[in-house]
Each structure stands twice: as structure tokens, then as C-alpha cells.
Amino acid sequence: MINIGLSGATGKMGKTIIEIIDQFKDCQISEKFNSTNNLNDLDNLCKNSDVIIDFSTPEVLEKLINYALKHNTKLVIGTTGLKKQHFKLLEKAAKTLPILYSANMSIGANLLNYLAKESTKILDDYDVEILEMHHRNKKDAPSGTALMLASTIAGIKELNITFNRGNRIKSKKEIGISSLRGGNVHGIHEIFFLDNDEIITLKHEALNKNSFAVGAIKSAIWLQDKPSALYSMQDIYKV
């Protein structure tokens, strides 16, 4: 039985994971951490868990990494809004621990990322823009998924990523991201490939949080026999 510690247990993703965990017979929630806990409670979270699924905040993640290293606890990180310093911490810790990070753990979003990569190779001279939409209470913008998609495309076309372009005219050497917030939208991401004669659109829409939660739990199971490294969902789905 795999003991999964859940960081961010009272958030939307944490609640969804708790709701569906019984679908997986080879794992259980061993310990929970949420915003009412003291950060030092992360010590017990890591001590009593084989792997942590983290959907918390960047501030919590920094402490979590330290305790995970102390107890040799594997990490599945789905927290978004991370900065360069957080990724440096993950890369350093991954020399000692198996860690999986993804801004979106659903198979659909990762398939979209693959399709974006392959489409970009074919539509080399097209302009590219990304539109993402989420519920009114989402704290970060643009979304981590939008940044993942933009990074994939920008890496192929050698483009700069722009958010909130304002009054400036679009440069040929950039990919723009636009964000909408409202209602109870779980997540919509659209990629537009545009030229003078046609527009090609790739789209993924999450109907609820279940696909993200399933991906996170599958990641925790997959990580059990893996050596120390920083992994992504592409390593699981082979896309």
C-alpha cells in the first residue's frame, strides 16, 4: 500500500483527490496538510508518507522540499505560480529525490501540449497566440498550463513569451498569452495558429477537477520505482 501525503488538502484539488482516492486500491491518504497547519507540521507529513502530492502555495513548497529531503519522501508537485527560485530548488532536490512537476496533470492537457509541439513544426510561419480561461478565484495569471504550452511552442520557434501586451503591436518573434477570469470555469486553453488565409485552433476544456486529480494520483504511483530525477507528465504519457 502506497502512503500518500496530501499538501493543500482543503483546496479544490485536495478535496477532489480525497473524493476519488478510493478508486485506487494500491494507495491511501496517510496524512493531510492545509493552510490551518503550522509549517513545521510538514515534518510529520513527509515522515508518514511514501510520496507527497502538493497542491498548496509556492511558500509552502519551499518548506516542503526541505522536509522531503530530510525523510527521503518522493514529491508530485502540481502547485502553480512558481518562480525561477522554486524551479532551482526542485532541480537541486531532484538530484536526491524522484520528483514529478507538472502545471497540469490531465492526459488531455498533455496531449494538447504534444499536438501544439507537432503543429508548430508544420505551421512554422504562422502567428501563435494562447487564450486561457479559469474561475474568478484563481490566484495566478497566466495559468501554469498556458505557460507550459507557450514554452513548448516558443522553444521550437525561438519566440519570446508575452503576457498583457497592452497597446504594443505584436512582434513576429513572440507568442502572446491572454487570460480571462470568471464564473466557475475549471480550465479552458486554446492555441491559435493564424496566417492571412486561415486560423487553426487547438483546444482543451476541463469539465471538472477529476482528470487533474487522477493524473496526480497516477503520478504518485508511477514515481515509486523511479530513480532520483525531475520528471514531467511527458515521461508518463510518452508524448
UniProtKB/Swiss-Prot annotation:
Its main location: cytoplasm. NADP(+) binds at residue 32. (S)-2,3,4,5-tetrahydrodipicolinate binds at residues 135, 144-145. One of its GO terms (cellular component) is cytosol. It is found in: Cytoplasm. Its EC number is 1.17.1.8. The keyword Lipid metabolism does not apply. InterPro entries: DapB_C (IPR022663), DapB_N (IPR000846), DapB_N_CS (IPR022664), DHDPR_bac (IPR023940), NAD(P)-bd_dom_sf (IPR036291). CDD domains: DHDPR_N. It is an enzyme of class 1 (oxidoreductase). GO terms for molecular function: 4-hydroxy-tetrahydrodipicolinate reductase; NAD binding; NADP binding; oxidoreductase activity, acting on CH or CH2 groups, NAD or NADP as acceptor. GO terms for biological process: diaminopimelate biosynthetic process; lysine biosynthetic process via diaminopimelate. The active site is at residues 134, 138. Pathway: Amino-acid biosynthesis; L-lysine biosynthesis via DAP pathway; (S)-tetrahydrodipicolinate from L-aspartate: step 4/4. NAD(+) binds at residues 8-13, 31, 78-80, 102-105. It catalyses: (S)-2,3,4,5-tetrahydrodipicolinate + NAD(+) + H2O = (2S,4S)-4-hydroxy-2,3,4,5-tetrahydrodipicolinate + NADH + H(+); (S)-2,3,4,5-tetrahydrodipicolinate + NADP(+) + H2O = (2S,4S)-4-hydroxy-2,3,4,5-tetrahydrodipicolinate + NADPH + H(+). Keywords: Amino-acid biosynthesis, Cytoplasm, Diaminopimelate biosynthesis, Lysine biosynthesis, NAD, NADP, Oxidoreductase. HAMAP family: DapB. Belongs to the DapB family. Catalyzes the conversion of 4-hydroxy-tetrahydrodipicolinate (HTPA) to tetrahydrodipicolinate. This is 4-hydroxy-tetrahydrodipicolinate reductase. The gene is dapB.
